[in-house]
Amino acid sequence: MRRLLKPIKDVGIVGYGAYVPMFRIKNEEIGRVWGVNGFPIQEKSVNNLDEDAITIGIEAARNALKRARINPREIRALWFGTESKPYAVKPSATVIAEAIGATPDLDAADFEFACKAGTEALQAAIGFVGSGMAKYAMAIGADTSQGRPGDHLEFTASAGGAAYIVGEKTSDTLAYFEGSYSYVTDTPDFWRRQHEHYPRHGNRFTGEPAYFHQIISAAKGLMEELDYSPSDFDFAVFHQPNVKFPLTVAKILGIPKEKVLPGLLSGIIGNTYSGATLVGISAVLDIAKPGDRILWVSFGSGAGSDAFSLIVQDAIEEKRELAPKTMDYVNRKKYLDYALYAKHRGKYIL
């Protein structure tokens, strides 16, 4: 049985863009408040008072359009992956589409699958363009992720996102998809019920049954279908809830950490949830050379992974200079203490 996901037409990325808010809080500051030592990362990004998943998505989408150099009205689908959408009943995708000038002749919808909502949207965009139904489709993954005060998730849950415009493969394409592979199981590792402010997690399911099983299975499935080995890839980006987990995956798969570190940003911006691998890939595209092959594997609790093989093309050299690079946002910092952080994140709930 053929398990590789590959559209009829070859498709690729014609534009990409990321956005990370400028505010930061150090893990040391969070630990000071809660009396905790030993931290999973160094610091994380924090959204401003007027920023949410929608505004992050808009900024990322605008950067993607700068690199694509296309009329936004040519985009026939805009799909937004997030688990922190501002409205329970009202699509966020329509707000983004209106803000970038893509309305009204397009399909728009919000996607949900915990931290892999962004790549879920990307899979749909690849299929939509690859079937011939549209010239361009945009997939966005962005979050202002939540963590209960004092919970270990609070040390990593952060804000950021990235957008990708998918189009038919041409010489103007920045990179193209060789194929993808998706893997899902019903694993109760993380959830948030309706009307609850913060997610809960089943600790014993978090590591091996959820994250490691899904990501490794998806990565191995993709490589098996494409008849590749880990050595065939120049870069690898895995979902990054922290620094330890993706480096452990790389070690298990036999991928040197030097191929992972360029896209591993969680140590300095935290876990951007639906944006995590999308932001990581954007950082890799900012430095990759034509001909480089990239392994891209997301993860979403509940649980599942999407794996992609991406080959960089010549057009990357010019187009990546047309918008701010990911590290430009990462290196732009203003630190908050815990009181201001709690205000920015709306943690004062009466």
Curated annotation (Swiss-Prot):
The molecular function terms in GO held by this entry are: acetyl-CoA C-acetyltransferase activity; hydroxymethylglutaryl-CoA synthase activity
**Superkingdom in the source lineage:** Archaea
- Associated pathway: Metabolic intermediate biosynthesis; (R)-mevalonate biosynthesis; (R)-mevalonate from acetyl-CoA: step 2/3
Q: Which InterPro entries match?
A: ACP_syn_III_C, HMG_CoA_Synthase, Thiolase-like
Keyword Ligase attributed: no
Q: Where is the active site?
A: 83 (proton donor/acceptor), 115 (acyl-thioester intermediate), 239 (proton donor/acceptor)
E.C. code: 2.3.3.10
Q: Which residues cross the membrane?
A: none
Extract one GO BP annotation from the record.
isopentenyl diphosphate biosynthetic process, mevalonate pathway
Binding residues annotated for (3S)-3-hydroxy-3-methylglutaryl-CoA, in chain numbering: 115, 156, 206, 239, 271, 301
Residues annotated as binding CoA are 204, 244
Name the Pfam families for this protein: ACP_syn_III_C
Q: Which family does it belong to?
A: Belongs to the thiolase-like superfamily. Archaeal HMG-CoA synthase family.
What is the protein name given in its UniProt record? Hydroxymethylglutaryl-CoA synthase
